[in-house]
């Protein structure tokens, strides 16, 4: 899994993950990767204070252009992740000379998923930018691509954390 964070908080996030019992913790740029089961994913979403999102990678691949991204995404068995009665959205983060516009990448991923379902079922899932049923994230660094399920939904900084101490007067 991948816990995204702000630059400079990677070490703190790694310590939080260690305290939660996560395994195989590796610090990266504005992220910390770790392994764990479904319970760990829920704990990470609920307990981590310095994480922005928890991503569950579903495919790593390389792509030199948008057509390769499309083909790689279309090759995924999407019925394992999404139904035609659900909505989805794609968030793209791109650091590449070839892929300059993240919106274009988002559209290519969306097109591949919609085309997959149309060919298999004759129907398509809906796209909803705000509050989709399934939020996907694609990260591209030059030619290295990672497609992930976003297990957090909204950014974790929007959680309503309740404190037991009285409010200041």
Each predicted region: which residue ranges?
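Accessory substrate-recognition/RNA-binding modules or partner subunits associated with SAM-dependent
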Residues: 1-134, 151
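Conserved small/polar residues in nucleotide/adenosyl-binding loops
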Residues: 163-169
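Class I SAM-dependent transferase core
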Residues: 147-162
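Histidine (H) residue identity feature
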Residues: 60, 101, 139, 157-160
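Conserved proline-anchored active-site loop of SAM-dependent methyltransferases
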Residues: 32, 138, 167
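C-terminal edge-of-domain segments
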Residues: 140-147
């Amino acid at each position: 899994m991948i816990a995204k964070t702000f630059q400079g908080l990677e070490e703190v996030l790694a310590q939080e993950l260690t305290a939660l019992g996560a395994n195989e913790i590796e610090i990266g740029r504005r992220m910390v990767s770790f392994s764990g089961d479904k319970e760990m994913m829920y704990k990470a979403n609920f307990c981590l204070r310095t994480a922005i999102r928890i991503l569950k990678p579903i495919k790593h691949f390389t792509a030199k252009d948008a057509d390769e991204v499309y083909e790689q995404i279309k090759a995924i068995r999407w019925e394992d992740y999404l139904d035609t009665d659900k909505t989805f959205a794609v968030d793209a983060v791109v650091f590449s000379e070839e892929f300059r516009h993240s919106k274009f990448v988002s559209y290519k991923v969306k097109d591949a998923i919609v085309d997959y379902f149309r060919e298999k079922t004759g129907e398509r899932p809906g796209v909803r930018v705000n509050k989709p049923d399934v939020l996907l994230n694609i990260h591209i660094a030059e030619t290295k691509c990672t497609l992930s399920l976003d297990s957090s939904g909204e950014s974790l900084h929007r959680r309503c954390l309740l404190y037991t101490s009285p409010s200041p007067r």
